[in-house]
Amino acid sequence: MASSWNNPAIFLAAALAVATAAQVVTAGFTTDLYWQQQPAPGAVTPYKTSDWHDGSATFYGDPSGMGDDFGGACGYVSNDIVSLYSTKTAALSTPLFADGNGCGQCYELRCVKSPWCNPGSPSVVITGTNLCPPNWYLPNDDGGWCNPPRHHFDMAPPSFLKLAQRVAGIVPVQYRRVPCQRTGGVRFCLQGNHYWLLLYVMNVGGAGDVSSLSVKTSGGGGAWIQAAHNWGITYQVFAALDNSDGLTVKLTTYSTPQQTIIVSDAISPWWITGLCYQGSNNFY
């Protein structure tokens, strides 16, 4: 039997597949690849910078600021942290974490009223990627830094060191919400199967958070399927989905003023769980 590689049509298809594969990059999942696309132009986010508020900050985890311990409660893994947020992350105390709705939000922090603040009190912008859980065995002002109602940021060490000296341990800060500046479109990482699909929503611009997610097949004009918030940045869809068709995703932010976008190219046809896909638009 003649080799199929002698067929010009098959050879061309294979060449195109190789060229397409060259456009994918590593993300945070086991076999994690996502389709890298350019962001489409869009309106400036209506989410505005807030006023300054009082809080406090410490640091935790690997000195590099990169690793799985910086995103567990939200659903990020190490490669997500590295590729999306670098070392500019923090675990949020319960009031800021807001049952996972605070995941992905961006804050600007500056050290105040401490001899350990770096000269000039420089600020740093971080993304909330984890929960700093309360410690009810310690008082709020002596070790229970993340106990409610405290507004506390347990930061990746490199970000904390931009604010203050390591010897401080804990410093008072002022913080404010700021619009998240992201590169590229919203990213969707998939787990589960064709009957229960779990979507990890990352790289969200503007308010940075999500309160509602719906999906529908891209080619057939079907009805929207409302996803349920699972935990952190994850949403689950209980429906039979045919992966031969791509998925369009509708997202609404959690913070006010709420904004909704439709990512028509969110997940390409023949999608596979375990991979990450990136749409072409965001909350800009």
UniProtKB/Swiss-Prot annotation:
BP GO annotations: plant-type cell wall loosening
GO CC terms, sorted: extracellular region; membrane
Alphabetical list of Gene3D superfamilies matching this protein: Expansin, cellulose-binding-like domain (2.60.40.760), RlpA-like domain (2.40.40.10)
A Pfam family annotated for this UniProt entry: Expansin_C
Signal peptide per UniProt: 1-21
Key word Membrane present: yes
The protein's name: Expansin-A17
Species lineage: Eukaryota, Viridiplantae, Streptophyta, Embryophyta, Tracheophyta
Superkingdom as given in the UniProt entry: Eukaryota
SUPFAM superfamilies xref list: Barwin-like endoglucanases (SSF50685), PHL pollen allergen (SSF49590)
Domain Expansin-like CBD: 195-279
Job description of the protein: May cause loosening and extension of plant cell walls by disrupting non-covalent bonding between cellulose microfibrils and matrix glucans. No enzymatic activity has been found. May be required for rapid internodal elongation in deepwater rice during submergence.
